[in-house]
Amino acid sequence: YVSPAHMTKWGDIMPVSRRLELVNYSAAHGSLVIEDDFENEFVYLQKPTPSLFGLAGGQNVVYLGTFSRLLLPSIRISFMVLPPELSALYRKKADQYNQTASKAEQIALCQFIRDGHLAAQTRKLKRLYSVKLKALRSAVREVFGKDSQIQTGAAGTSLALTLSTNLTWQELQKKAQTNGLRLQLLREAPGKITLILSCSSMPVADFVPACKLLKDISQIQN
């Protein structure tokens, strides 16, 4: 199981060379790769990389995708592309599968895609998140300084920020909640806490104030 467009929470992408290694290994050993192509639509800093499914010619790879990042998450429609031999097996047992997505939503989504609206939505969100992620990086640099420890990748809507603080994660989280900040922990080490900061739902105008608030509470001594 791999998510090549989301190797880390801050958007690292699996290079083509590594993808080819996996494809060749699965072909040589008859193994099956499950490819979850989450956030493959949001690649900004390099050209889009071919999927494992495409590189393998549809053999030995199951491709998983979702529309949750492009459309309303409440629609809850995902999809799976199977290699030919598994596709034939699935068709034989399809009546045992419990479909939870309504037919009306599936038909509407199909028409939405046919009419080109999904492609337009993808381009729109890609531009939006590219601008917002750049603004978030700038806000972090402005507030925490040019030497702040930031990790970013070529894709996604998040970055990792390492804070130097005497607080524990539980203490920082409690202070953040008291001040209206919701934080996501990546890792904790003595004197350091690494957080995942997302640009997706917060307005750009709030990036600098939120970073200033985070800096203030992380420097509070208990």
Regions flagged by a language model, labelled:
Residues A28-H29, Q59, N179, Q221:
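Helix C-cap/helix->beta junction micro-motif
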Residues G57-R127:
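Conserved core segment of the aminotransferase class I/II
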Residues S17, E21, K92, Q96, ...:
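Inter-domain helical "communication" segments and dimerization helices
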